[in-house]
């Protein structure tokens, strides 16, 4: 199968992560995966949800949205509709779970970290790009808090990233574009840590059921892609 952008089945799209993209947040990046572009920012509040008061534990939560011009047809803002749509709710919960999985909140104190992921151009894989980019913004933010003496150490247990895999025209592909996603028989999103532990697997047969062997193949391919993304994260942060 020849992919639209001439990639092999096992290739990621070109990935670029620009740090310190905005002036005001504690951490911010623009992540570009092919034609998908997401701005990820990190802010902090000196308080925690009621269920954490008095525990000396921190918290992290996320919001996700798509700008009106991010899709071929104008996307109506959620605020105009009066409610967050189900897809956005699902994705922002996924982003929050993915990042909470690698943060040691006992070292944050009673503070809440806010992750905001805003899609400025959508061409497939916005949720996985948001997770991968938000981690870099989070690392930068925590490093700044440490530098300012607000926290004693960066409370990151390990790196985390995410990627999509799927089956299109009977072939297993890594990092689906929007065109491929629309034609996919199987669509899957995988979130994994640097040590190879899964945070989340979201997989659905859109048209044709898939076998156990195909599932294993997709998970192995996703792992390869995620390890490459973590390498890119580290290089972006100057750790490699």
UniProtKB/Swiss-Prot annotation:
Domain of life of the organism encoding this protein: Bacteria
Q: Give GO terms: molecular function aspect only.
A: 3'-5'-RNA exonuclease activity; RNA binding; tRNA binding; tRNA nucleotidyltransferase activity
- Return the broad EC class: transferase
UniProt EC number: 2.7.7.56
Q: Does the keyword tRNA processing apply?
A: yes
Q: Write the record's keywords in alphabetical order, separated by commas.
A: Nucleotidyltransferase, RNA-binding, rRNA processing, Transferase, tRNA processing, tRNA-binding
Does the record's keyword annotation contain Cell division? no
Catalytic reaction list: tRNA(n+1) + phosphate = tRNA(n) + a ribonucleoside 5'-diphosphate
Q: Where does phosphate bind?
A: 87, 125-127
Q: Name one GO biological process term.
A: tRNA processing
Q: Which protein family is it in?
A: Belongs to the RNase PH family.
Instruction: Give the record's subunit note.
Output: Homohexameric ring arranged as a trimer of dimers.
What this protein is reported to do is described as: Phosphorolytic 3'-5' exoribonuclease that plays an important role in tRNA 3'-end maturation. Removes nucleotide residues following the 3'-CCA terminus of tRNAs; can also add nucleotides to the ends of RNA molecules by using nucleoside diphosphates as substrates, but this may not be physiologically important. Probably plays a role in initiation of 16S rRNA degradation (leading to ribosome degradation) during starvation.
Q: Which HAMAP family match?
A: RNase_PH (MF_00564)
Q: Which protein, by its recorded name, is this? A: Ribonuclease PH
Name the species this protein comes from.
Answer: Dictyoglomus turgidum (strain DSM 6724 / Z-1310)
Taxonomic lineage? Bacteria, Pseudomonadati, Dictyoglomota, Dictyoglomia, Dictyoglomales
Q: Which gene encodes it?
A: rph
